[in-house]
Amino acid sequence: SIHGNETSGADAALGIIYHLIASQDKDVLDMLKEMVIIIDPVMNPDGRARFAKNLEQYRGTAPNYDDQSLIHTGDWPYGRTNHYYFDLNRDWVYLTQPETQGRVSLINEWKPQILVDAHEMGSQDTFMTGPAREPINKNVDYDLIKWGNVFAKDQGQEFDKRNWRFYTGEWHEDLYPGYSFYVAFKGTLGILYEQSRMAEDGVRRPEGTIQSYKESVHHQYVSTIVNLKTLKENSKAMYEDYWDGRKFNVSSDSKYANRSYVILPTKNNGRLNVLANKLKAQEIEIYKNNKQISVSN
């Protein structure tokens, strides 16, 4: 979980860790033989600690199912942000925060095939996942969109089997690279979960039923297991598409062929160095030119 007050994803991650370690199911054992699974339950520990303190302060002796109450709305400073009150899910491309820098460094090292980003949304909502709707960034390989549909179909079928409410797309678009969608530019399929937020006590829904926090965690947990199974079945084909796409992007037929971007020197060396360091952190190659050149648009 990247937002500290959206806790069901982090708690589901703990269940996933236990399941992968303890299970003797053949499917799980085969998965562990063939895959490297990296689980980072809490990207924002400071925000989660702040949210946990709010729960401790505002919780009563009996569960409060009214989502208008303080335990559900919280107060400032909210747990969404990190210690510096920065929303980490806007920072993937800019790398201004230490948490983001560490996460991006890990992604660059392992180059995962998929990345799951578990969130929460309004308490009267249900569950949303991909595929995203338009606008979709035109610099993303079509193969990632294709595979996103495959993963979404498997996940949706599992939800249907369990009679769980969910929807896809709607307000979820893949355009701005400051979100976790940023990984698509590295050839990784980003998968978003948005679970209605229960704030641990649960919430009374319009039809009168109570949705528990346990259910929220279970939705995130099952989604992850399904996504891992889909990856296991399609990993080789995804690698082939990744290889073909990367090879084409550096070929003479690519729209990116024969292009260079020149950063002109200025008197502000500090800003120039900051830009250069951010580009290098994103594994963008930089060369220093010492010769006279001419350029045209």
Describe the role of every protein-language-model region:
Residues 2, 43, 120:
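Active-site metal-binding loops of divalent metal-dependent hydrolases
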Residues 2-7, 11, 15-35, 84, ...:
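Intrinsic-disorder/low-complexity accessory segments
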Residues 32-51:
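Short, conserved secondary-structure transition motifs
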Residues 49-67:
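Aromatic- and acidic-residue-enriched segments that line the glycan-binding/catalytic groove
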Residues 55, 66, 70-74, 102, ...:
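Alpha-helical scaffolding within the catalytic cores
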Residues 65-70, 142-146:
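Short acidic/polar alpha-helix capping motifs at helix-coil junctions
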Residues 74-89:
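Active-site-adjacent "subsite" loops/lids of carbohydrate-active enzymes
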